Design a protein with these regions (language model features):
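A broad structural signal for short, well-ordered beta-strand segments within beta-sheet-rich domains
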Residues: 1, 6-12, 64, 68, ...
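Exposed beta-strand-loop-beta-strand "reactive/processing" segments of non-cytosolic proteins
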Residues: 1-28, 94-137
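A short, surface-exposed beta-strand/turn
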Residues: 23-48, 124-156
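Long, charged/polar, surface-exposed segments that mediate recognition or autoinhibition
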Residues: 36-91
Length: 156
């Protein structure tokens, strides 16, 4: 996640983990030198992973060059007359069981999903001033990385 909107500077990395006792936790790491947050329990209503069946993200398969190529491709998918400004977040998630079975519909446990949010502006309309204040006007789109590596984009 970026720190300041439209800065394109990595600020925060959040991870979730599950231990052998099937307890799920989350923790955040700041790129500014701040100490990581304390481990906190994951809300089991929505995520109740089981250690034995959780695939997990293979960190050896994270490829910075591939991620950069995905971002470069997403830039070409923006509407004409708009300019890329930043990546708001980049997520790799795995479908895990929920504590409430209602939230398990349409899930394939172990299946991983990659997506990221791009932020962009309309050329010539990046700011708006009113009552002496200037606001930045930007749009967001979610980019989904399909299993075969192709990208699809949907404006939020």
């Amino acid at each position: 996640m970026e720190g300041e909107t439209l800065s394109d500077n990595l600020f925060l990395i959040s991870v979730k983990l599950v231990n052998k006792d099937n307890q799920a936790f989350s923790q955040s790491y700041y790129m500014t030198g701040l100490e990581p947050t304390a481990l906190s329990d994951v809300q089991r209503t929505f995520e109740a992973p089981e250690y034995e069946t959780t695939v997990g993200i293979d960190l050896t398969k994270l490829d910075a060059a591939q991620i950069a190529a995905q971002i470069a491709q997403a830039k070409t998918m923006l509407p004409e007359g708009h300019s890329f400004k930043s990546v708001g977040s980049y997520q790799i998630e795995e479908d895990v069981p929920a504590g409430n079975s209602v939230f398990n519909r349409n899930k394939t446990f172990g299946k991983q999903h990659t997506s990221f949010v791009v932020r962009f502006t309309e050329d010539g309309k990046e700011t708006e001033s009113s009552a002496g204040k200037t606001s930045y006007i930007y749009y967001e789109a979610e980019v989904t990385v399909e299993p075969d590596g192709t990208l699809s984009i949907e404006e939020n």
